[in-house]
């Protein structure tokens, strides 16, 4: 199995957009997800001076859901107030660049739109910056990761409940999995799910 670090994806299930986040970690496996307001946060449970291991991971908005592996979650959400997803991704990722840690960890991001069938993925690493606007496909997800994944990949991913989405993400064939978060469109907005459950 591959070690991909942080992974996120966007897709379409029963005609509705969804997104997910999979935290895989060798260095800081003792982390948990916490819901606060319209956001989800990854919190590290051990002492460290590393500023990158606790961060906002999901931000739910009226029209969009944003998922990333760092503090750029909130910057992208703010940018979406006045510009389109593709520009929000490019502007924020270009401005913040990759993480200045021992691994030069890339920043990754995904956006889905309520009622939409298109999604956006973005990536910035030491020597690469890209953004893709994608036509979402029924029963599939497009995903990207911080390590050992060239660009983005497509996988089959269908589910019947938000909880099953998080469970299936946790079953993806990647090493050192810690937790998974699912984001699914519903009539009122967005629904979250977690594995392990909160």
UniProtKB/Swiss-Prot annotation:
Listed GO biological process terms: 'de novo' IMP biosynthetic process
Keyword NAD in annotation: no
Keyword annotations: Hydrolase, Purine biosynthesis
Gene3D superfamilies xrefs: Inosine monophosphate cyclohydrolase-like (3.60.20.20)
UniProt entry tagged with the keyword Hydrolase: yes
GO molecular function: IMP cyclohydrolase activity
Cleavable signal peptide: none
Record-listed E.C. numbers: 3.5.4.10
Protein name listed in UniProt: IMP cyclohydrolase
Source organism per UniProt: Thermococcus kodakarensis (strain ATCC BAA-918 / JCM 12380 / KOD1) (Pyrococcus kodakaraensis (strain KOD1))
Lineage, broadest ranks: Archaea, Methanobacteriati, Methanobacteriota, Thermococci, Thermococcales
């Amino acid at each position: 199995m591959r070690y991909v670090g942080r992974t996120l994806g966007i897709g379409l299930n029963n005609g509705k957009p969804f997104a997910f986040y999979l935290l895989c970690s060798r260095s800081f496996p003792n982390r948990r997800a916490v819901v606060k307001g319209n956001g989800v946060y990854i919190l590290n449970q051990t002492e460290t001076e590393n500023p990158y291991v606790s961060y906002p991971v999901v931000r739910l908005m009226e029209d969009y859901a944003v998922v990333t592996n760092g503090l750029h979650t909130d910057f992208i959400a703010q940018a979406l107030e006045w510009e389109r997803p593709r520009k929000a991704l490019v502007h924020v990722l270009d401005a913040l660049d990759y993480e200045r840690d021992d691994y030069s960890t890339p920043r990754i991001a995904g956006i889905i739109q309520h009622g939409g069938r298109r999604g956006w993925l973005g990536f910035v690493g030491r020597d690469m910056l890209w953004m893709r606007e994608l036509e979402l496909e029924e029963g599939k997800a497009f995903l990207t990761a911080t390590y050992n994944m060239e660009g983005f990949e497509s996988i089959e991913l269908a589910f019947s409940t938000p909880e099953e989405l998080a469970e299936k993400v946790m079953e993806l064939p990647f090493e050192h999995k810690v937790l998974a978060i699912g984001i699914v469109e519903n009539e009122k907005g967005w629904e979250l799910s977690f594995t392990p459950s909160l």
